[in-house]
């Protein structure tokens, strides 16, 4: 869904784009592949995803970013199992060589490994991928990657724990892939609450102090405002008690979820009988009321159940894809909002 422009030190112009599991580099002068890049003009996007990934689905739904002589990419992978890992990778934009990898599902001894109760979970889990795109602070050399959930989307009995670095904004040194900071927006996601857009960067004024900031919008209708240098919240982000009494075998949900104290949610946070379209027929209304009365809908983080759970806003809700546009002059952020209920 996009291309990445690159100009080498000789002022030659190229574009990168992905088709299937291949990242191509094309010479803009003649439209031909750059044969010196990777394998005669492309690199296999399975590279850097670990053992046994070659047969798994992987592509890119958003273009990569250029930093110096690197093309840095996220990926789109399966939302069920088996799924490839969502590692963030940087390739040499000239040769196609793999330069660095950040593992979004930590392995033994790596930070975040302890966020999975099963010590072998990393061997079989996939996902935690940055499908929505990446953001670069070129001046500071910081890459920001918004990740989605670990697969499966709606059951986490095989991945008990908070599941780092899924559902997180991850700040990386763009030159070497080393983590600078992270902030997790959903613990142990079983609601498909992937971060749906790249964060936007802007200077935010608070009490006459200018803060280099980052705004990350979510499917749930929240905006997380963070200092983009150190990842600290600009306003308090509270750990709110949420329903955690899952009846699914093996499932252990987080007892709290992070909720920004400011700004208020930009999407409605509940769907009641009164929200049914007033223009539907009486028969349709009765049918909808029957469905709503039979499913779980106590909270935006209601535990998934075998009988059904209301997800509102839905799997493609909040600010999915549309993203945000900052107005630093007026200290405002503009965003779209999708309000669609799913079961």
Where are the language model's segments positioned?
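Repeat-blade elements of multi-bladed beta-propeller folds
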Residues: 1-22, 56-82, 123-152, 158, ...
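Extracytoplasmic/lumenal domain signature
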Residues: 9-11, 23-55, 87-124, 156-195, ...
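Short, surface-exposed beta-strand-loop junctions and turns on beta-sheet-rich folds
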Residues: 32, 80, 151-152, 232, ...
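Short acidic (Asp/Glu) and glycine-rich catalytic loops that position anionic groups and cofactors
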Residues: 149-150, 268, 303-304
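Peripheral, non-catalytic segments that deliver or gate enzyme domains
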Residues: 213, 221, 239-245, 315-319, ...
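N-terminal leader/propeptide and maturation segments of large enzyme subunits in energy/redox metabolism
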Residues: 262-291
């Amino acid at each position: 869904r996009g291309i990445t422009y690159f100009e080498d030190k000789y002022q030659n112009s190229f574009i990168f784009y992905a088709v299937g599991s291949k990242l191509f580099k094309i010479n803009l002068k003649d439209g031909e592949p750059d044969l010196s890049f990777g394998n005669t003009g492309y690199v296999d996007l399975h590279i850097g995803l670990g053992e046994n990934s070659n047969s798994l689905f992987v592509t890119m739904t958003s273009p990569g970013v250029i930093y110096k002589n690197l093309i840095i990419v996220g990926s789109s992978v399966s939302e069920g199992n088996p799924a490839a890992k969502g590692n963030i990778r940087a390739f040499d934009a000239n040769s196609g060589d793999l330069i660095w990898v950040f593992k979004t599902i930590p392995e033994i001894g790596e930070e975040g490994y302890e966020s999975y109760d099963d010590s072998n979970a990393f061997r079989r889990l996939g996902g935690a991928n940055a499908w929505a795109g990446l953001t670069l602070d070129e001046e500071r050399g910081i890459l920001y990657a918004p990740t989605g959930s670990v697969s499966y989307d709606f059951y986490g009995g095989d991945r008990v724990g908070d599941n780092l670095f899924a559902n997180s904004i991850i700040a990386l040194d763009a030159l070497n892939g080393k983590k600078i900071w992270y902030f997790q927006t959903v613990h142990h996601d079983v609601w498909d609450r992937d971060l749906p857009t790249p964060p936007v960067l802007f200077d935010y004024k608070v009490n006459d102090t200018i803060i280099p900031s980052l705004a990350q919008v979510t499917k749930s209708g929240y905006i997380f405002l963070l200092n983009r240098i150190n990842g600290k919240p600009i306003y308090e982000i509270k750990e709110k008690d949420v329903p955690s009494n899952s009846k699914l075998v093996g499932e252990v949900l987080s007892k709290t979820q992070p909720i920004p104290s400011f700004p208020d949610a930009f999407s409605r946070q509940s769907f009641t009988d009164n929200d049914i379209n007033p223009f539907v027929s009486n028969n349709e209304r009765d049918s909808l009321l029957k469905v709503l009365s039979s499913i779980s809908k106590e909270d935006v983080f209601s535990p998934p159940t075998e009988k059904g759970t209301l997800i509102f806003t839905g799997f493609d809700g909040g600010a999915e894809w549309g993203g945000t546009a900052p107005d630093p002059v007026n200290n405002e952020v503009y965003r779209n909002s999708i309000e669609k209920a799913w079961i």
